[in-house]
From Swiss-Prot:
One of its GO terms (molecular function) is structural constituent of cuticle. It comes from Locusta migratoria (Migratory locust). Keywords: Cuticle, Repeat. The tetrapeptide (A-A-P-[AV]) repeats found throughout the protein are also present in many proteins constituting the protective envelope of other species. The keyword Repeat applies. This is Cuticle protein 8. GO terms for cellular component: extracellular matrix; extracellular space. PROSITE patterns: CHIT_BIND_RR_1, CHIT_BIND_RR_2. InterPro entries: CHIT_BIND_RR_consensus (IPR031311), Insect_cuticle (IPR000618), Insect_Cuticle_Struc_Prot (IPR051217). Component of the cuticle of migratory locust which contains more than 100 different structural proteins. The keyword NADP does not apply. Sequence repeats lie at residues 16-19, 22, 28-31, 37-40, 44-47.
Length: 148
């Protein structure tokens, strides 16, 4: 039985597979062109280049800074100087108990790093604000007693 388009219908009521499939007209391998040329050889005299060493800057600096925050009690300072391979400096800070810790240091190639620590008692301890702790009230609810 054929439908209105000329396809053969089977008992299942579906359409039949096409009778033929189209195949490519021709297969071809890729075309490779062979190019033959003489190698390009060039001879040149060696290039002489003078290498100039970059000048190394002599390391020399000095700095210092300080912080004095009376609200938080953060009080400190530092200073340092470098001349070639020798570094000298110091820093100090106020400890929570009001004392001052001072560190003096020096570093060089011959002796390495050396530090001396001094502690100076404070004239008065730094007041630290007390921590306020508030506890929430405990909620207690008793369940009714159940009788059987």
């Amino acid at each position: 039985i054929e439908d209105e388009y000329g396809n053969v219908l089977h008992a299942s009521g579906g359409y039949a597979a096409p009778a033929a499939y189209a195949a490519p007209v021709a297969y071809a391998a890729p075309v490779a062109k062979a190019v033959v040329a003489a190698p390009a050889v060039a001879y040149a005299a060696p290039v002489a280049k003078a290498v100039v060493a970059e000048p190394v800057a002599y390391p020399k600096y000095e700095f210092n800074y300080g912080v004095h925050d009376a609200h938080t009690g953060d009080i400190k300072q530092q200073s340092e100087a470098r001349d070639g391979d020798v570094v000298k400096g110091s820093y100090s800070l106020v400890e929570p108990d009001g004392s001052t810790r001072t560190v003096e240091y020096q570093a060089d190639d011959h002796n390495g790093f050396n530090a001396v620590v001094h502690r100076t008692p404070g004239t008065h301890p730094v007041a630290v604000a007390p921590v306020a702790v508030a506890h929430a009230p405990v909620a207690v609810a008793h369940a009714p007693i159940a009788y059987h």
